[in-house]
A protein has these predicted regions:
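A glycine-rich dinucleotide-binding beta-alpha-beta segment and adjacent secondary-structure elements
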Residues: 131, 280-281, 287-295, 328-341, ...
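N-terminal FAD cofactor-binding segment of flavoenzymes
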Residues: 155, 162-211, 218-222, 264-270
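Glycine-rich loop(s) and the adjacent beta-strand/alpha-helix scaffold that form part
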Residues: 149-175, 198, 204, 316, ...
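Helical element adjacent to the flavin cofactor pocket in flavoenzyme catalytic cores
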Residues: 293-363
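Extreme N-terminal leader/targeting segments of oxidoreductases
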Residues: 8-15, 61, 68-133, 193, ...
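N-terminal Rossmann-like FAD-binding beta1-loop-alpha1 element of flavoenzymes
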Residues: 131-159
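Rossmann-like flavin
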Residues: 57-60, 65-69, 77-78, 90, ...
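FAD cofactor-binding and catalytic pocket of flavoenzymes
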Residues: 212, 385-509, 541, 549-554, ...
Length: 615
């Protein structure tokens, strides 16, 4: 998959590419691991009667080219899986980084103002059972804000987090180690469908705010108005004070164009040539040193995730954080939620308590495990009715890369830096997004030596992410072994919108001076300005798109009992004292990075609980 070429080492001979990947796979669930093994085994056996690993280099490249040109969607899925895993371990090898000129520094800049990293107190469960007024499941944007709001109002709060706590003193040094430690299922959660879509989410103290790009958008006014009109969320138009308070506390500011890096500047220049509306992205990372390492945890905690913002506030007000505890069932007595039963110590070797751990909540139980974890817990508990886990939206996204004659060195910049909202009526948001080679290398064009040439060219690559506010839907369910199962069906209409967005991203690249564009659609290959019209005239099947998604939402949505899981106050239909406070509540796709909307919802819902207590 990665032969020697022009100074790049051969993966099989010169680089230990399998070791780091094996460590990553050790972090995934048995079900995910079995599916990965099945896919890679199928790839190995496809050249029947031979095996891929026993073919000559020339035969391998010929076979890979035929797979890439095939009309069979399953071939493209297996090929992409093989490329991703081959690149994961290879891309982080020092020999590869040195050859492509990759170097970055995440040291604090002079005069910077990093967020203090604690304290978060003793996070070990105090015995097999504890009591509190309110138990909060999850420590991400929803759970952390709810915990801070409730604790500062004088309530006794316990926050449960399945993952570990990290900060700038102890983030893993290597990217794959960080992915294994910080993400659920080692970042390999997949929404099954055609195409299958990776949906990586965090499992760590602070949730996905630890590994996201720090992008801060308010929910569009039109979306909030729709939620008020169609789903009865009367307060949806009253969130401006919540947004403003969060922006002030998190020190959210628009990115200085001088600091966004060349990748963002090229997107800005291309959009300006086209007259497309957009602007620098607002972020909660004033001390950012532009190292583009956001998905591995900020090594200097310049990004004000929940672990260095709202959670310390909650703990300072008396909340107790418990890590390494996986919530398994909401406890119900006489129609009232009374707490949560957990497995303690299963995911955190530093946790002193192992076995069953129970939290009894006198007043309320808040579930904020994200749009995957929240329905998973509700389903295990037999709660939420027929709608639990349904209505999954994910903002399917496509990486659109381009080659520039000039050096871009996108890793020396902010991961997400510039947005283009010109095509919002088409439900599209474009964001200049650059990820390190370990994350993005598998999406580069070509196979074999062609893919190696793309890796050599990585310093000349610019990239734009095309995000769709999807009408397509999926579902979270439980597999036969009790593990989470995600599925998603991309409609033809949404596939057409994504293809339109890819063409617009290509236009921006060409307007900024790119010589060729890589659209990440099966059998399309490389685009030039002359081929763009032909591309736009082509209709693509959903299965031909290569997508990722980072914003799951809607799986416990606010709607009537027949169409949703929760009422407008976040309470689960039919259960007293049980609330949801995360992106699961969103009735439809929010259309922008959801962190700030989650914060506003959590603040509103937890604030209402305080108001009810105060009478």
């Amino acid at each position: 998959m990665a032969p020697a070429l022009d100074g790049l080492p051969a993966a099989e001979r010169d680089v230990d590419a399998s070791g780091p990947v094996a460590e990553l796979l050790a972090a995934v669930s048995p079900r995910t691991l079995s599916r990965i093994k099945l896919g890679l085994r199928a790839f190995e056996l496809l050249p029947f009667p031979w095996r891929f690993s026993r073919l000559s280099l020339a035969a391998r490249e010929d076979f890979l080219r035929r797979m890439e040109g095939s009309r069979l969607g399953v071939y493209h899925e297996l090929l992409l899986m093989a490329k991703v895993f081959a690149t994961l371990g290879y891309a982080v090898a020092p020999e590869v980084e040195q050859r492509i000129g990759f170097e970055t520094s995440c040291r604090l800049a002079d005069g910077s103002d990093p967020q203090p990293s604690g304290p978060l107190g003793n996070t070990k469960p105090a015995g097999e059972e504890e009591e509190c007024d309110v138990v909060v499941v999850g420590s991400g944007a929803g759970g952390a804000v709810a915990a801070a709001t409730l604790a500062e109002a004088g309530l006794d709060v316990i926050v449960l987090e399945a993952g570990r706590s990290f900060n700038r003193e102890d983030y893993p040094d290597q990217p794959l180690d960080a992915i294994a430690a910080l993400y659920r299922d080692g970042g390999l959660t997949i929404a099954e469908g055609r195409p299958p879509i990776p949906v990586p989410v965090a499992r760590t103290v602070g949730g996905t705010t630890v590994v996201n790009s720090g992008t801060c958008f308010r929910a569009p006014a039109a979306v909030l108005a729709d939620w008020r009109r169609r789903f009865g969320i009367e307060w949806a138009g009253e969130l401006d004070p919540c947004f403003a308070e969060a922006e002030q506390f998190l020190r959210v500011t628009p990115l200085d164009p001088e600091r966004m890096g060349r990748n963002g500047q090229l997107a800005m220049e291309g959009a300006a040539v086209l007259g497309a509306s957009g602007g620098p992205i607002s972020r909660n990372a004033g001390s950012c040193v532009q190292c583009s390492s956001c998905p591995f945890g900020c090594e200097i905690d310049a990004k004000r995730g929940m672990h260095v913002s709202y959670l310390p506030r909650a703990v300072a007000a008396g909340a107790r954080l418990r890590t390494g505890v996986e919530a398994r069932r909401v406890l119900i007595e006489a129609g009232q939620a009374t707490g949560v039963r957990c497995i303690a110590g299963a995911l955190d070797s530093r946790n002193g308590c192992r076995g069953t751990y129970t939290v009894r909540a006198r007043q309320a139980t808040i579930v904020a495990g994200g749009a995957l974890g929240t329905p998973e817990l509700l389903l295990r508990s037999g709660l939420g009715g027929r709608q639990a886990g349904r209505n999954l939206h994910i903002h399917p996204a496509c990486w659109v890369g381009a080659r520039y004659d000039e050096e871009v060195r996108g890793w020396n910049g902010v991961m997400q830096s510039y947005y283009v909202d010109e095509w919002e009526p088409q439900r599209l948001l474009l964001e200049a997004t650059f990820t390190p080679l370990a994350f993005g290398g598998g999406w580069l064009q070509g196979t074999g030596r062609e893919h190696q040439r793309a890796i050599l060219d990585f310093g000349h690559i610019g990239s734009i992410g095309v995000h769709l506010s999807d009408e397509s839907q999926g579902r979270i369910g439980l597999a036969g072994d009790g593990s989470l199962r995600a599925s998603y069906k991309l409609t033809s209409e949404d596939a057409d919108r994504l293809a339109f967005g890819i063409a617009r991203a290509a236009e921006i690249h060409f307007a900024a001076g790119a010589t060729e564009v890589y659209p990440n659609i099966a059998r399309v290959g490389t685009l030039t300005p002359k081929r763009l019209a032909e591309f736009e005239a082509t209709s693509f099947k959903p299965s031909e798109l290569r997508l990722e998604a980072f914003h799951p939402m809607g799986t416990a949505r606010i709607a009537s009992e027949s169409e949703g899981v929760c009422g407008p106050d976040g309470s689960v239909h039919g259960v007293k004292g049980l609330h949801v406070a995360d992106a699961s509540l969103f009735p439809t796709s929010v259309g922008v990075n959801p962190m700030m909307t989650v914060i506003a919802f959590a603040q509103r819902i937890s604030g209402e609980l305080v108001r009810q207590r105060d009478g």
